[in-house]
Each structure stands twice: as structure tokens, then as C-alpha cells.
Amino acid sequence: EVKKETGIDAQIWAARSIAKVFDKLNLPYSRTLKTQSPSFTKNFLQEHEHPLVKKIAKAREINKAHTTFIDTIIRYEHKGRIHADINQIRSDQGGTVTGRFSYSNPNLQQIPARNKDLGPLIRSLFIPESGCEWGCFDYSQQEPRLVVHFAATTPVIKENISVKEIVQSYTNNDIDFHKTVSDMAGISRIQAKTINLGLFYGMGKAKLQAELGLSTKQEAEELFNKYHDRVPFVRDLMHETSRWASREGEIRTLLGRGCRFDKWEPAQFGMHTPMTWEDAVKKYGENRIRRAFTYKALNKLIQGSAADMTKKSMLDLYKEGIVAHIQIHDELDLSVESK
């Protein structure tokens, strides 16, 4: 349909090819800061209003489902089961620095959940033990709750009126964090959720702008300023966590696990290769260096703490004789004996 309407045989995974479609339709799109290459994020394509752009997004989803999920699952199936490699923490074999589980051979955490058509079809390939039902249990808004917890227990932030307002809302009922923030900031829920998660994950302004589908830097700045003016505690927590990591060289998760910041870089802004303290001092001088990656401190705090919670729940279940089939981020899936 894209070729029929535009005359372009678009390669759905090639940004330059998609750009030709946008140019033909006279539609604006973002470019990368460094090389000015066309940039099309998943959110940008999915949220776009033009019907042909939505078809490109859908074609991508179908293609990814087939090549990444279905073909991979079939390749690793053995006697009706799949035994993936589980990585506890970052190593040469894979894993994450935050302590969250990751999977390889195959990566079962990539099984789609949100797509209303493909998700149920692919997930239906996984079945419980004989005579049981499939149980799926997850934490409600695990990461936003952790952000509120740390904001409400950090001395320089906890007195902020926006923190008190959200804490009170959680006390009264099970709120939708992203909807509450959107109401406070006067922006849409999808914008609030994108900014929230972007800040939680240490996403830069340029990436956030692309995720939000905003074509100009001015539009993005206006939206960010509106968000931070009315919901300042997220930015304050991000800055305070970064300062702590710079000062102490580590942050501690909810259950006390340490995430270290032991690489250094020159203090001036720019693209630099992080190195050991000894090498950095030798190259730049002791008073002209700073710890690297401290902007990721909030991300490590939140995801590391989420990993603590989920792993503790797995241990608690194991002590009761219950072993999950799979753990996906904040979700545990297991066989439940039918009543």
C-alpha cells in the first residue's frame, strides 16, 4: 500500500528509505544531532496520525514478531520446552549492570505483550503444566512507586509539594502515576509517561524529543519546562542521585546492593572515553576529571531496586515450593493448579 500510494518500495527498517516516504508525503521528521541522519523511533511511527505511517509501524511489528520471536522460539524448542540462558548480572555472556535478569538463546523478555493482535498469539505458544492454568503476576507500577519512595525519603526533596501530593494519592488509593503526573503538569498521559520513563532511564533530551514525536527543539524545551515546573521532584531526584554517585562513587539499591561508578572522564563537556582514575589523572590531571556515567545513577537506583524486589519475591516463592517458568522484568509467570 505504501508503494502503491507513493511509488516508493520502502525498506521498513531503513531510516533513509522511510525518509523518502515522508518526503514524498511532505511530512516532517527528526534527524540525529551528530550526523543529521533521519531518525524514526518506534513511538514516533506508532503515534503518527498519517495512515501510511501507521502501516509502516504495523509492518515493522509483524516483521519483528516473525523474525525475532516465532523463528527464534522454533529454533530453540526442545521436546516442547525452551531452556534459555539466564544472566544474573553483567558478564561476558550478557546481562545487565543493574542486576535485572536478562535472557539469551533465546531472549524471552522480548516476547510482545502490548500489541493487541500479535501479543496474545505469540504468548499462546507458552502453556502451563498439565492440569494447571497459566498464572501471570506482576507489580503494579513498580518503577514509578520506587521513584516516589526515594523522593519521599530524600531529605532535600521530600518536602516538595508535588511529592506530598503523589504520596497522599498513593495512600488513599491505587493511583495511575502517569495520569496523576499528566494532570499535575497539564499535558497528555502519553507525554507524561514518555517523559517519566525517559527520565527514569537517563534518556537525553534529543532522544526524548524523538520519542515524543516533536519536530523542533523549541517544542521539546517548552514541554520539558512545563513538566519540570509543575512536577519538579523527578528532576530533583535525578540530580540528587547523580550528585551522590559523583561524591560517593556508588549508589545503594533498596536492599543495599551497590552500583559502582568507578570510571572517570575529563570535567569539560564532550564525547570522551571513560577510563580508570589512574589513567584519567595521568592524562588530564587530578583536578580536571569527574566520575563518568553519573547521569545514569537514577536509572541504576530504580532498576536495581526493582530487581531486588522481584528476585526477593522469587526466593519467597521458592521457599514455598513454587518455581516460576519465566520472569520478565516485574512479572512472574507460573503454573497454577486448577481448582
Where are these regions (language model features)?
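Short acidic alpha-helix initiation/capping motifs at coil-to-helix transition points
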Residues: I12-W13, N172-D174, G198-M203
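Conserved "right-hand" nucleotidyltransferase catalytic core of DNA-directed polymerases
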Residues: E1-L118, I127, G131-E133, S140-E143, ...
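Conserved catalytic core of nucleic-acid polymerases
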Residues: L27-P28, V181-V323, S338
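Histidine-centered active-site/metal-ligand motif
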Residues: D174-H178, N299, H329
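Conserved catalytic alpha/beta cores of large enzymes that bind or transform nucleotide phosphates
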Residues: L125-V147, I161-L197
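Mixed-charge, glycine-rich, non-catalytic linkers/tails in nucleic-acid processing enzymes
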Residues: E1-Q11, A151-N172, K226, R230
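Short active-site loop/helix that positions an aromatic residue
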Residues: A19-L25, S140-K158, S338
